[in-house]
Amino acid sequence: MEFATVSPPDPGTAAAARARQDTLTKPRGALGRLEDLSVWIAACQGQCPPRQFERARVVVFAGDHGVARCGVSAYPPEVTAQMVANFDAGGAAINALAGVAGASVRVADLAVDADPPDDRIGAHKVRRGSGDITVQDALTAEETERALSAGAAIADEEVDAGADLLIAGDMGIGNTTAAAVLVAALTNVEPVVAVGFGTGIDDAGWARKTAAVRDALFRARRVLPDPVALLRCAGGADLAALAGFCAQAAVRRTPLLLDGMAVTAAALVAEHLAPGARLWWQAGHRSTEPGHALALTALDLEPILDLRMRLGEGTGAALALPIVRAAVAALSSMATFAQAGVSDPSAHP
């Protein structure tokens, strides 16, 4: 599918927000990164001061990967379906952390190798499991288009229902292997640079994972620079849908927090699908996965948090949401020097 042209967050509002920051009762720049985040949010909303987020929404994209059969994960493939049920029941880490952050959670089954728990979760399902990318394409061309369209449709559904901030999450045994292939292909690095320990594999597991990425990357590099072909060859329905989701959020002018390795790998592809989409995103955190840092650098995104996390699900991004909320509160609720009757040092050089 083709995405509409992405226009950037409003530069005039960004300038107004920066100017307002300089009038608040604090030394200029004293709130550091919070000031930058507040300017970004104001520009995304097109208003200064910005309004607090009322309906932050986490969407977890779930899918199985054939490459998991190569021994690249510490967990068996059936865990994906089990975790989908856990998300729906409210028992996963993302449910707990999103609750603290004031966000609600949706899980979407794109390619879990099991029947979905209900039609709501499986409404956009493309297939059961994606192909083993070491020896075959993850998807057919038609499935790739369906997955991209599904991700875009999910973004539209959430924005149309009132979501004012989106968080992209993931679940899928083997998905960091596919993600490492995407990142290595788009940043032109070798597998050993992009591969991490994922779910906690040992050294032998890391060697198997690196070999799988090597084999898949050999195939993936043949289709560059086509981002859709890359998703077909080495992604998966969940990662393709994530790419569509991230791109469409930007088209819909809705700020989005990226999570870890799988999400950011998909976002890197999304930036190629919809140039300029990255201006609507912030990196919630930096994962311990080495490929995540590569993807963030390629997107020119600075992570908000670094807590040595590597879970996925949207957890790192959810933890960053209270900081983003604090940035909004500072810009919108603090008094100016004039309002507070406090002398402004900048007015008396």
UniProtKB/Swiss-Prot annotation:
The keyword Transferase applies. Its EC number is 2.4.2.21. Keywords: Cobalamin biosynthesis, Glycosyltransferase, Transferase. The active site is at E313 (proton acceptor). One of its GO terms (biological process) is cobalamin biosynthetic process. Residues 1-20 are annotated as: Disordered. GO terms for molecular function: nicotinate-nucleotide-dimethylbenzimidazole phosphoribosyltransferase activity. Pathway: Nucleoside biosynthesis; alpha-ribazole biosynthesis; alpha-ribazole from 5,6-dimethylbenzimidazole: step 1/2. CDD domains: DMB-PRT_CobT. It comes from the Bacteria. The keyword Transferase applies. It catalyses: 5,6-dimethylbenzimidazole + nicotinate beta-D-ribonucleotide = alpha-ribazole 5'-phosphate + nicotinate + H(+). NCBIfam families: cobT_DBIPRT, PRK00105.1. Catalyzes the synthesis of alpha-ribazole-5'-phosphate from nicotinate mononucleotide (NAMN) and 5,6-dimethylbenzimidazole (DMB). Belongs to the CobT family. This is Nicotinate-nucleotide--dimethylbenzimidazole phosphoribosyltransferase.
